[in-house]
Structures are given as structure tokens and as C-alpha cells.
Amino acid sequence: MYAAKMDYGFPVRTPPPPDYPAVPVADAYAPEPFAPEFSARRQAFMEHVLRNPAPANLKAPFHEMARLAAGGMPHHGIFYAALDYIDERKDCADFVLHAVLRLLLQFADRLDAALLDRARQTVLGFKFWPDEAGLDSMCTWTENHQILFASAAFLAGQMYPDEVFPNSGHTGRDKMAIHRPRIQRWLDLRFRTGFSEWLSNVYYDEDLTALVNLIDFCQDGEICQRAAVVVDLLLLDVALNSFKGVFGCSHGRSYEAQKKWAATEDMADTQKLLFGRGQFSLQDSMSAVCLALSERYRMPRVLYEIANDLDRAEMVNRQRLGIRLDEAERWGLGFEDLEDGMVYLSLEAYAHPRTINLFARMLDAFDWWENEFFVPFGARRGLLSGARRLGLLPLVARLFERDITRNTREEVHTYTYRTPDYMLSSAQD
């Protein structure tokens, strides 16, 4: 399979402040809940942040924001590195942007004027959706990225309602009006169908970051309420499919490292913060910081009890997640509209016989032929465009469906079996 060659480098150009932690201090693994109350778990997490340097990756600004909230001296060079990363429109800039938005919305009174002005310019200048100007290789279309981009656009528009965002020409109010339906549709599909990136020990972290930022800062009460419901449902997924702090079930999307070593799971810190088991790793987490700093979301106590209900002899959890492409109409989806196309791409249905014509149109509409993720399609642009003009793309896709749709995630049925001593999990067609 083609692997995009992306630059996720996060260079920090200034030294840390005096007395900044030099080396990581490992957290102790807790096989049993180490504190029954969230306030105590939150305090332990914040103390762990203060003892440790930020990770050397693009999640670093979240940890420095937590350090600031905990009364420590943050590494301001990391905040400026975050702004550089966003300005360069590197892949996952939307992750970093959510740290900047929370920083501005929750801690602006603790930032100097120069950093505030630079952050404002970065937010106003960002490319919030693939139909806006500029060539880049940001992934905007997977399930987690869609809510990250749409929620960031809405919150940015809310912050600067009368400002013009120069990359699109939209005012902030325009941004809110454009992205509100996208947020609502995403929330509706998660509530009705669950996640295409089901039970992901990587991407649930990203989903939570966007959703908790909406809950905390969005002034639209309906969006806040619906986002909180989806967070509850997502955390129910985690509670039902985890074992002693490890989100060790079947995953719709994950990576080798996170499968081999639970401490590298993006959800590791969130598990220990919310459920009391596991380990604070500070390696690749955003949502733990957002949940620890949230002033408006508190997880229902019953989810803590479910996650820690390991005394019964056995527990079986069966779930259905996602949609079937042959039932697209059931979910209000067609095969002409680019907005529907974004829903299909959240399933990674690029070259499916039912979606390939629409996907080819999206490559044109969004100038995606040069996007690093779509290099294999760009190399065959002439062939694909010709086949599309002749109406042959669906036929070609059908002939090679087994090979070219292997990443597509349609409806899945998961089965998790948990006992006091072990947990097994599988995904079934």
C-alpha cells in the first residue's frame, strides 16, 4: 500500500524556561483504580504534566497549555512552533489548531500581546476546508479530521465574527453558517451509526479534542448539547471495550506502535484520567488535557463504574458501527453532492464502485491531484479522467474492487468478551 511521505517535524527554535523538566519521569501503571474521584485523578494528571517535558511531537502545545493551567511556566517556544506548524499547513495542523483555539479562549489573559497577535493572524489565515484556496497535503476528509476542521472553523468564526478570513473571503459569521451543518451532520451520524473509525485507540483522542472544545466554547446550545451526548457515547465505547487501562479491542483504525505497546495509545492518558487505571504516558495525547481543563463537561459516573466492572465472571459486548454503502440512501446520502462525498471519504471509500465517480470529481474540485496522500491517483490522472468521461470508472472499480477498496470501512459488527483476567475482541462482517 502507498504510504504518504509527510513532514510532521515540530522544530522549537527557542530554549525552555529555567527549571523546565529536562527528562521524562515515568508514571506508575495502575492496574486498579488509583482514585475514585475525578478531582483527585485530575490533580494527579496535572502534577504529572508539571514533572515532565512536553513530548517532542505536535501534541506538545496541549501539554504546555496544561502546564500553564497548573501554575507552571510554559515553554513559549512550543506555542510559537505550533503557530509555525499551522501556518505551513502541514498535515495534522488541525490537531495543533485546537490547542491554539483553547489557549486563546481559555487562557488569553495569561498570554503576552505579541503571542496573542501572532495567534490571531494564524487563526484568520488558516485553510479550514478543502474548497478554500491553496495547495497543501493536509488530510481533511477522514472521520476525525472532518470534525476537527469543521469545529475549528466554527469556533474561529465565533471568535472573530466580523473579521474577514483572507484565505476564503468569508467573515466569521459566514464561517459559522457554513460549518454548522457539517458539525450537525457529523454529530447526527455518530449518534445514529457510531464511528467508522470504530473503537480507535488513536482517533477517539482526536474526536474528543474537537468535541470537548465545542462543549466548552461553542455558544450554540444545540451543538453543545449534542456534542456532549456523542462524547458520552464515545466514552461508553471505551468503557465497554477496555481492560485495566488498555483500550485493547478491535480498532477501525490504529497503528503498529499503538497495537504493540499500550502506553503509546493516544487514549492512554485519557483512560487513567477518567477511569483511574493505566498510565499517564504524555506521549501522544490531546484529549486528556482538554478533559482535565474542561469547565463544562463531566463524564457520567456510570461510565466510570462500567469501565471498572471487572469482577463479574464474564461480560459480552456486541456493537454495530458504521454504514453500508448499499444503504446510503437510508442515511440521506446520494452520489452527486460533494458534501455527501466527504461522508464517504470518512469511510475511506475512495475507489468503491458506488463512489469512484464522485471521488474523481472531488479530486478536481479540491485540487487534490497533487495532495501527497493521493499521489497514486495523480500518477494516473489521465487514465482516470478518460475513464470517467467514458462512464467506465464504476466498471473498472468493480473489476478490481477486492484490491482497491481494501481500506474501505463499511458496517462492522464488533464482539468483545471480558473477564476478570483477560479480554478478547474481534471485528466481524
Where are these regions (language model features)?
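Extended hydrophobic/Leu-rich segments
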Residues: 1-12, 34, 38, 45, ...
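A compositional/structural signature marking long, glycine- and acidic/polar-rich segments
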Residues: 162-280
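Aromatic-lined, polymer-binding surfaces characteristic
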Residues: 43-218
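Extended polysaccharide-engagement surfaces of secreted carbohydrate-active enzymes
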Residues: 225-429
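Short low-complexity stretches enriched in small and charged residues
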Residues: 16-20, 111-114, 165-170, 372-383
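Low-complexity, Ser/Thr/Pro/Gly-enriched N-terminal "stalk/linker" regions
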Residues: 2-77
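Exposed alpha-helical structural elements
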Residues: 99, 114, 118, 182, ...
